[in-house]
Amino acid sequence: MRFLLGLQYFASKKGVGSTKNGRDSESKRLGAKKSDGQFTNAGSIIYRQRGTKIHPGLNVGRGGDDTLFALIAGTVKYEKFGKNRTRVSVIPN
């Protein structure tokens, strides 16, 4: 004679589902690298940005990723122009 036992096994560990959170992109370190009145060398990065938040002025070049850099050595000068735009120039010493 056979006995059928209705055994039920309980989990010894809680089932843990995966989450869709828990990751983020690395910061890009955007923003001003040289402030107003600071000396800069030719080729030095003045402002790292996405888009043209700050526009290039005299003796300032713009890279492919909109980074502004000094074309000559001199003093950095930020100035307002237009209604609400800012440009950065490098004045030779």
Curated annotation (Swiss-Prot):
Region (Disordered): 14-36
Post-translational modification: The N-terminus is cleaved by ribosomal processing cysteine protease Prp.
Propeptide stretches in the record: 1-10
GO MF: structural constituent of ribosome
A single Gene Ontology CC term: cytosolic large ribosomal subunit
GO biological-process terms attached to the record: translation
Keyword Hydrolase: no
Disulfide-bonded cysteines: none
Pfam families: Ribosomal_L27
Residue stretches of biased makeup (Basic and acidic residues): 21-36
Source domain of life: Bacteria
Alphabetical list of PROSITE patterns matching this protein: RIBOSOMAL_L27 (PS00831)
Keywords assigned by UniProt, alphabetized: Ribonucleoprotein, Ribosomal protein
Gene3D superfamilies in the cross-refs: 2.40.50.100
PANTHER family assigned: LARGE RIBOSOMAL SUBUNIT PROTEIN BL27M (PTHR15893:SF0), RIBOSOMAL PROTEIN L27 (PTHR15893)
Similarity remark: Belongs to the bacterial ribosomal protein bL27 family.
Descriptive protein name: Large ribosomal subunit protein bL27
Originating organism: Mycoplasma mycoides subsp. mycoides SC (strain CCUG 32753 / NCTC 10114 / PG1)
